[in-house]
Regions:
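Juxtamembrane/disordered regions of integral membrane proteins
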Residues: 1-147
Length: 147
């Protein structure tokens, strides 16, 4: 039981850290003009596609690590549930508390933290992320069982 709980906790932390590192690195390398639509803080199509790819890869890794630590059982399923429930809760909070578009004009490059705080995504993107994440965890958990 302790291994399962530890697997879920470590898996979630790994997922979070990998996503922060990936998004900050990609934004730093690609810049604001690639990440956002022209003169706005609305995420570009390229950023949205990359975002889903990062979510899938990092959650597969998290599911794999969770399953490896738990050594069997339903820990990856629990982690997938945590990713889905927390992700959807944050999505609901985000859409309820933040306007979809502030019509703020972005001028050139902006620092990473400003980009994160001002970025806007369509609602479907915000709600699809946790679903992709939960699926990734389940895939990673199954990979460990096969290996």
């Amino acid at each position: 039981m302790l291994r399962s709980v530890l697997g879920v906790i470590v898996g979630y932390i790994v997922m979070f850290v990998l996503q922060v590192i990936a998004f900050m690195t990609i934004y730093t390398m690609m810049g604001a003009d690639w990440s956002f639509k022209p003169a706005s803080y609305e995420a570009s199509t390229a950023w949205t596609a990359m975002q889903f790819g990062v979510i899938l890869v990092t959650t597969i890794i998290a599911g794999l690590i969770c399953a490896a630590i738990a050594k069997g059982g339903k820990a990856p399923l629990v982690l997938a549930g945590v990713v889905l429930v927390l992700g959807l809760a944050l999505a609901f909070a985000s859409t309820a508390l933040r306007p979809a578009d502030t019509h703020e004009i972005r001028a050139g490059n902006v620092p990473n933290m400003e980009a994160m705080s001002k970025a806007r995504h369509p609602a479907w993107v915000i709600f699809l992320g946790p679903v992709i994440g939960a699926a990734g965890v389940l895939i990673g958990g199954k990979l460990k069982r096969r290996g």
